[in-house]
């Protein structure tokens, strides 16, 4: 199960920034590369407020090395996705600005498992289980788990 996975760079990220990020991560790994706006997590203002108030959530910028490692992981996942043979569920909000919904589409189309499900929640933000349609998302997740759990 993959919930709004980071499988492709965002379409709004300039290509020069992607190329430069690897260089910066080597020479200045702690460089504060990008800040994540909590307002992009959910359309539910209570979820956004809870995130901003949570002392256990990192509110600083993502270091350049972390960003470069995520980009490298994306490439490894893309190269190996056709070897995956277990049941796969991917779900993503179509208005996610933190991770790219097109990455989930491409992964869903290219994964090797014949048992694959891609669900896109129209208008949904990054945290689909904490967004406005959370009940629908959770119900679909539970139904998928029941369909894939061994009978006992």
Language-model regions: role of each:
Residues 115-152:
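Catalytic active-site module of serine/aspartate enzymes centered on a nucleophile-bearing elbow/loop
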Residues 86, 100-110:
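Short alpha-helix in the alpha/beta-hydrolase fold that links the catalytic acid
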Residues 58, 95-99, 127:
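Acidic catalytic loop of the alpha/beta-hydrolase fold
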Residues 1-62:
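Alpha/beta-hydrolase-fold enzymes
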Residues 84, 90-92, 96:
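Short beta-strand/loop motif that positions the catalytic acidic residue
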Residues 62-80:
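Active-site nucleophile elbow and catalytic-triad environment of alpha/beta-hydrolase enzymes
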Residues 1, 89-91, 119:
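Conserved hydrophobic packing residues within short motifs/helices of P-loop NTPase cores
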Residues 15, 102-103, 132, 136:
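Generic recognition of short, well-ordered alpha-helical segments
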């Amino acid at each position: 199960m993959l919930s709004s996975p980071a499988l492709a760079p965002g379409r709004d990220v300039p290509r020069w920034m992607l190329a430069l990020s690897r260089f910066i991560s080597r020479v200045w790994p702690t460089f504060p590369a990008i800040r994540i706006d909590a307002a992009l997590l959910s359309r539910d203002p209570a979820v956004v407020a809870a995130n901003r108030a949570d002392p256990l959530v990192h509110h600083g910028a993502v270091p350049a090395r972390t960003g470069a490692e995520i980009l490298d992981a994306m490439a490894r996942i893309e190269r190996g996705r056709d070897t995956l043979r277990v049941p796969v569920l991917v779900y993503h909000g179509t208005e996610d600005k933190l991770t790219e919904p097109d990455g989930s589409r491409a992964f869903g189309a290219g994964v090797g498992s014949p048992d694959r499900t891609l669900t896109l929640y129209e208008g949904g933000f990054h945290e689909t289980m904490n967004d406005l349609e959370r009940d629908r998302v959770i119900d679909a997740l539970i139904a998928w788990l029941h369909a894939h759990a061994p009978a006992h």
